[in-house]
């Protein structure tokens, strides 16, 4: 049959009143109960069977079936609780398989609120499903319950469907009022119609019309127009105020607002009060959950403040807003990207379609009702800087950190209201688009998360800091770990925790910075550093600061020396040290100026601060049951006080290494590749190696600067060649692995080294290469989650032995594995050591790591 051809509905009078239902029509019946819909769907089913139609029933609701089981009807039973995306894609796949001219009955759309909690997602489902049905010239019946949905939700249905009918029951019969009939018209089509047993008679006489409107008026809840989200929280608030809020209602609020992940939900329910949920609800934009990052931040704050009452005045309060996860899919649907999203979820389109979809997400528009909520939020913040942070459903959960995989964007927020709105909306687009970044896609696929529902919620935080004239920043910021797997002294206690702290914005602590060295702090010995001389302290310290520039309206990195004239003396005292030796040399030449570097030394000398951080990290680990990773800022005042703003907390997957018993072999030096002490991360383990990739420091140093990235690509090519072979690979690389400055090390991405089991950063002072663990950086998080062992090979007493010549007798497979990089032969070597007995042993308690060949291995 051709598109728009008339079909029979089982009600000849209705066919006449509507000028026939047509192929391509989606017919939405707004009813007071599902039973009212049954009255009309029964004849439709019988007529379709008589006409030998391909009849399909989509079953997903809790109400009794609308169509009985019979051979002539195909039934698909689906579960909307799996999530919007899997459910909607499965419906799409069914429709695609059934093809053209199919006839459908769907369960009540209002029941989707039970699974998805809000109108927003029900409307999204209809807006993506209805057009696909239309394209295939189908006919589909959908019931929806009157009074359960917002005006906006019904408006979205009205704008998408071809036919919308209002059904009322009264005086022993049914009334039907067409609200929309696409591409059809008659003088009485949109009048209320009364069913007299055979015909649908339009009401034109005054008494009959008056009686119809009286029936409408008498219906309960007919004008409520609240969706289930609003109804639920309104009722919960009333129950709370009356002292009648149940434990099950608290569990429902946790599920709807915060998380459905079992371990996180258990912690939330243990620590949150009813007021906590209502505060979140009050600061929500849209609906859905607030995502993993927001969940972790709020949970950590509640745990810390409950268990550390003596530090209450030292915690900076938060006033964050949360863009619900439903808004992400609403944005995709509103910008007509859903078909592309479905293609991207396939095996062939997973990477291929992602780039195009990313561009579309980066340039979309927001629905007016969402944009209005953005405006109201920005009015609250005024011209205070804010940060727009990813908070996906799976992010920062047990086992999945997603560290650095999604974007966070600072908004300096200093322009006019319209300028600030444009800046903010672009920041949200950037976060949404980052879900299609190759690194995020690869991360999800490697961890088996590519088939899971991964909606993107957003956390909007006021940037914690101080205005220093033309720039804005906190006094200090950093990352804190409740357990340190990296010690540089025998007498350090890993359970005391560790900080990686910087002056200014914390981006220099969580990202692997180039040319700078954040301060590494063991909280049992906060004054201790790895450096012994003033020259070393100066060289391996922070010389650049990340700030928000209020004149250029952007995040900027500036040299510390450029900031010095603008900093008050009390602040300098807290975070800076003077290189008195350098200042003395300058004075001898008749030059008088400050030579400073940032170490946060006097802040760390404040025992109130370090004791607070140590206790906070301990309390969080104790309650989470695993080590945790946090982000924080510190703001100091001229009178010596300080406040800590806890920005983020996530459980740290500590990998396969641990405190299990490992006996280090006593190797002859001639059989030792390296032996380090207090320079590794990854716990106790034994790894029998198959492949060693070595990058020669001198060769890499002499290689043309503009082509040093070739070395990174080459390493990626080699490691990918071993994918799926379960080979144990060791990479020896000069300087910093993963730097973006090739003069400091090889600029590999994590994807280039993800197949490795062991990484070693090798020091070479003659070439200027210096390892840096970057504890707390996103690269560090990737190593931890992938269970990759790390060691630094310094030119200090921490390295007891390093003999790369041990590898030279082994066959070099470079030419075989990287033939397209002949110029790198001799710079990159690929030693096949399989079966040789070359192994790594690491013992966590002593902090020693040994790699070599033991007898009998």
PLM feature spans:
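C-terminal regions of RecA-like/P-loop NTPase motor modules
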Residues: 2-4, 184-221
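Glycine-rich P-loop/Walker A and Walker A-like loops and their local beta1-loop-alpha1 context
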Residues: 6-62
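Conserved inter-motif catalytic segment of the P-loop NTP-binding fold
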Residues: 50-114
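Substrate-engagement module of ASCE P-loop NTPases
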Residues: 115-116, 121-148
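Phosphate-binding/switch region of NTP-binding enzymes
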Residues: 145-200
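Conserved mixed alpha/beta core segments that line enzyme active sites in large multi-domain catalysts
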Residues: 147, 265-267, 271-310, 365-764, ...
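Flexible inter-domain linker/hinge segments
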Residues: 202-279, 455, 463-471, 550-558, ...
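A conserved helix-loop-beta module that forms one wall/lid of the active-site cleft
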Residues: 278-343, 348-368
